[in-house]
Amino acid sequence: MSQATAKVNREVQAFLQDLKGKTIDHVFFVACGGSSAIMYPSKYVFDRESKSINSDLYSANEFIQRNPVQLGEKSLVILCSHSGNTPETVKAAAFARGKGALTIAMTFKPESPLAQEAQYVAQYDWGDEALAINTNYGVLYQIVFGTLQVLENNTKFEQAIEGLDQLQAVYEKALKQEADNAKQFAKAHEKESIIYTMASGANYGVAYSYSICILMEMQWIHSHAIHAGEYFHGPFEIIDESVPFIILLGLDETRPLEERALTFSKKYGKKLTVLDAASYDFTAIDDSVKGYLAPLVLNRVLRSYADELAEERNHPLSHRRYMWKVEY
């Protein structure tokens, strides 16, 4: 066992061992909400790295209703639900198995319905004390890069796992670097009724998650995650000096899209919060995977912005009016 493999979640190790010798021609990422958002970088990895395996990302219920014709015995379906009892995702696991697909579920609760429905389950850690490599993002990347290594002999597994192992230190430095900025953001946006987010490539899922989970779900602030590549095809008409934007710049191949959007926004906007992964210390991370790991750092930093905003607005991130409280 290599040093990198030894750092991989044991449940993921078991899955990867059983994956050897299997034929997979399609990977489906299936989840809802924030659990779906964390899968965007992994879809990006497959697009960039896989030579023979197609991949798609679906909201769980649409996965069932659309019923992709490619779904079958040569498919791998990766699912995620933090609670493990998201009804649509549990049903999606059963649906996929019914089609003969191989399924692995990620969850914080290994005894949950989703864990029982999938053939394999990988538990991740959660909370401020969780190490980066053991979080939902970290475990998902273990599955993704491990799958690429097993099925296609992809060479980035070692670099990705070592990078995940070093990522906690990157988090800690970035959080210190952004501490004052997060407080200033909270004070400046305390009374805002709408905040847009924008990114592209591997980073888009982070913008999407912050928009739908943090701002809309947890703070009841109107929001929309704008793809930087789509900005100049409609959305840029909304910007002026009164409209707040959070703009993310990553380290992947689509960074020029984000830079172009930022340049225009600086010209016509004023309330811009810019998080640039290039300003964080990635020196311990191999160059070949920096673009893939940057979204994880941006996500962690943005969480600190969310904590400060919730504190400033006296609106706890745990507060809900519909979710888990009414029938829906």
Swiss-Prot record:
Cystine pairs: none
Molecular function terms, GO-annotated: carbohydrate derivative binding; glutamine-fructose-6-phosphate transaminase (isomerizing) activity; hydrolase activity
Annotated ranges, domain SIS: 15-153, 181-311
PROSITE patterns, A to Z: SIS (PS51464)
EC number(s) on file: 3.5.-.-
Keywords: Carbohydrate metabolism, Hydrolase, Repeat
Function, in words: Catalyzes the conversion of a range of fructosamine 6-phosphates to glucose 6-phosphate and a free amino acid.
Native source species: Bacillus subtilis (strain 168)
Name under which the protein is recorded: Fructosamine deglycase FrlB
Subunit structure: Homooctamer.
GO biological process: fructose 6-phosphate metabolic process; protein N-linked glycosylation; UDP-N-acetylglucosamine metabolic process
Pfam families linked: SIS
Signal peptide: none
